[in-house]
Amino acid sequence: MGIRSYKAYTPGTRNRSVSQFEEIIQIKPEKKLTYGQHRQKGRNNRGIITSRHRGGGHKRLYRQIDFRRNKQGIIGEIQTIEYDPNRKARICLTQYSDGEKRYILQPRGIRIGDQILASPDAPIVAGNTLPLTNMPLGTIIHNVELQPGKGGQIARAAGTVAQIVAKEGLLATLRMPSGEFRLVSQKCLATVGQVGNVDANNESLGKAGSKRWLGKRPKVRGVVMNAADHPHGGGEGRAPIGRKRPLTPWGRPTLGRRSRPRHKYSEALILRRRKNA
């Protein structure tokens, strides 16, 4: 996938770079696998903001993605490679030999006409899905389950990849995309290979309007607010925050304070925390 950069025709195109979408084949999605969705826009059932900086954006149709990959022993053929507005990764329309069609995440290197298989005996080829116990050490994987049968939850974003680094007993040790080392049951399914669209992080929006198209609203710094609106606010002119440590708008410590619960059930499964933690 290539990245197209713009010349500085306007201030908005000076730093703008977008995907060329050269691998996109299908324009309209499969109608039976799409449905409308009401986006919450950061509001709860009473219409009160519970998550700031969300709202607006272009209307989207949700594509139903097969994260479980539970069509065991049935060969599927890649029919199309499509754009999905709900994620950075591309998606593939797969038609199985029994006639059913499903969307899957596009693994890197997959082309139209390639065949994929979900089976315990499937070969170690990009796009195939099998249990971790049947994969050799060092295999790079994506769409990894945390609980057997629940569906893939790890390494689903564009360009992400996890790796099997060890196996012992009923558990396998994975190196996560964040750098964290975590234990996962060897019964969990995973898909071989890396998620496609690896250059997604190299795109630059270039202007504020592009972020509004994505449904993201402006983030105002607390230091420029009034003292009544934020603990960092107030003062004469450009003033420091006036506190020992940064605080949230509601007075809680932030920017460095760990927010993960201390006694979470999965704490014993994490061998090494992520790199930037």
UniProtKB/Swiss-Prot annotation:
Keywords: Chloroplast, Plastid, Ribonucleoprotein, Ribosomal protein. PROSITE patterns: RIBOSOMAL_L2. It is found in: Plastid, Chloroplast. This is Large ribosomal subunit protein uL2c. One of its GO terms (molecular function) is transferase activity. One of its GO terms (cellular component) is mitochondrial large ribosomal subunit. It comes from Staurastrum punctulatum. The gene is rpl2. Signal peptide: none annotated. The lineage of its organism: Eukaryota, Viridiplantae, Streptophyta, Zygnematophyceae, Zygnematophycidae. The keyword Chloroplast applies. Belongs to the universal ribosomal protein uL2 family. Residues 35-57, 226-262 are annotated as: Disordered. Part of the 50S ribosomal subunit.
